[in-house]
Amino acid sequence: GDVNQNSDIDIIFFHKIPTYKIDFILNQNNYENYRRELIMATPGDSIKLYIYLNELTAITIPLTKLYKTSLEFYDFGGKINYEKLIKNERVPGIDKRLVLITPLPKGHEERSILNNESIAAKKVGVSIDTINERKRVLLRREEHGRTGVFLKRELSLEESPEAVLTKLARENSIIRKKIN
């Protein structure tokens, strides 16, 4: 809805793919100075590989199954597929301020989701539970700042994400259960 030159871009794969394929494509396209990290926000969340191409562009690859809440997280923010992107289509989404941004033919409309949760849920196509969960997290973050994550492991470009994850699973039963 309110995409501009300084907007961040998150590219997400919704199914597991071998990470070496992404590394290969990046190398073929002369991306050399990118950062990678394994992230598991909470013990109940999926484990993902984040590849940061620059300050505004990230690629997310799930290394374990994405659950409904993880999938709806992307709808919440305004998920768009490649075909719609090529056609310059825009979709509604909710930002970190808890503002629903609805694209208009020219510009966009902004509306707080507070006390408008069911309207927001319908607009972005998620459950009311997802709206309430994201609202809880973002309001807590506003009050207390960003809290820690369960797993955050920076990777060198030489490390295989899958090999590091296997090693971490040997040391941690929660991670072990996720990858099995």
What do the predicted segments below correspond to?
Residues 2-6, 15-180:
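Catalytic core of pol beta-like nucleotidyltransferases
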